Amino acid sequence: MTRVEQRLAAVNVTVALVALFGGVVTGLFQALEYAGVEIYPALAPIVRSHYHSVSIHGVLNALVFTTFFICGFVPFMLSRSLQAPLASARLGWLTFWVMAGGLVLASIPLVGNAATVMFTFYPPLKAHWAFYIGLTLVVVGTWLVTLNLVLTWRAWRARNPDRRTPLAAFMALVTFAMWTIASLGLAAEMLVLLIPWSLGLVSGTDALLARTLFWFTGHPIVYFWLLPAYISWYTLVPRQAGGKLFSDPMARTSFILFLILSTPIGIHHQYTDPGIHQGWKLLHALLTFAVFFPSLLTFFNVTASLETAGRARGARGWISWFGKLPWTDPSVAAQVLAMVLFAFGGVGGLINASFNVNMVVHNTAYIVGHLHLTIGTAVTLTFMGITYWLVPHLAGRALFSRTIALVQVWLWFGGMLIFSPTLHELGLRGMPRRTDIGHISYMQPQWKTLLPLVGIGGAILFLSAVLYFLNMVLTVAVSRRAPQPVPEFAEAVSGPDHAPAFVDRWKPWLALAAILIAIAYGPTLIRLAITTPLTTPGLRVW
């Protein structure tokens, strides 16, 4: 690995953390509004409404923070795993500037209240054309990352024809292969429907076709967020905790299943949409339950790996190994606590996928609570844990304060234990999501008793974030000690040689993924494309 990979990781992670800061601040505004604190009049004209705040929060956290962090961290891991530089430094820098340019272009209308369409940007809500083109450029940048990773791997393979691809590199390639396939839906929505519509080249669009193309990408993007966290959980955390990965072949199998199953499941977000046959909705429901299986493999494999670490540190009982983990290491503590809360988020996701039970929670605050257990904890807290070693390494300076880091990690865990279950309960009591709750005329008594807890949980999360950013800034600007060594990759109890050779072949898995997508999406997309008139005009509500 050269300084180029480190600099590319540094600039991408920097943009990601700046975006996270903006998303956290706007998240506090929404939590306070839930608690009955009228804050938006004091923020005008910077933040003009609840929906302006939600749009900024969603785009910065769910799209910008995650994408830039992943595009910094995953190539870093692949390069380090292969012990080889990226194939093209120029391509790496071109990628960053394409993405950064797209971010600036999209941010101008977003901040200016000309793209208050939330991070799903469903039509007929209409944003400024710069918002759509900017986000499209960010997606194009991720494709360039995929190209660089593949070129790097092929160069490594030419030098090592008989070696099994190292696990971290294998997972990095699967992550971006899955995302490149899945992002084609979003690209089609942007290029065919939204950009021409926003530029005035066509008079209308269609909400159902746009939503279907969005969810072609919109659910797989969850795995684009999660799989980099899994890379750390599988390849680094067992070693950081003092143990070994339980099974390398099982880890590879889980990622292959994610590659095959992550995309043909998006219609489970559209159970209530007319115009899609119930049979296709049922197929997507079954496939959504199927994609839960590789997460179960991950749960078993990572838990077994942590148990080996706890027992290596002296534990003897069935449960006591958990207490023997190195809880004084903020990187480990953050990621293990992220795993704990994600277990509940994963199980809760089965309710969203269920063909009938989904009707109880659909478009309620339950979904907000679920999303904050997945991206808000499993992803965000894991990425925070990663930065506790990655930022010191990139800056060449030791983490400023492990104590502050540990306090931050536990505050995030505690705040989310208040914030997310309360939103789940509010959803079960019928409170809608994506609604300006502070100004509704139909407030229910059973909601009023719980809403202050959302504000309390959100305030604790914000305090945790303040400590996190303070620690990051002081690490870069003030710390003078040398950093700790970068965590080594974990050895495996059952190593890569125990996996069949065909696991390392790409064509069968990519072909199977394409066939399954064609079956699950082909008939619906073809029918909608042929029969749907593009007549829906644009609306700007806020």
Locations of regions flagged by a protein language model:
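Generic start-of-chain signal for non-secretory N-termini
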Residues: M1-V11
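Hydrophobic cores of alpha-helical transmembrane segments in multi-pass integral membrane proteins
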Residues: A9-P41, V47-A84, S88-T116, W129-W153, ...
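Membrane-interface helix termini and inter-helical loops of multi-pass transporters
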Residues: M118-F121, D273-H277, V357-H362
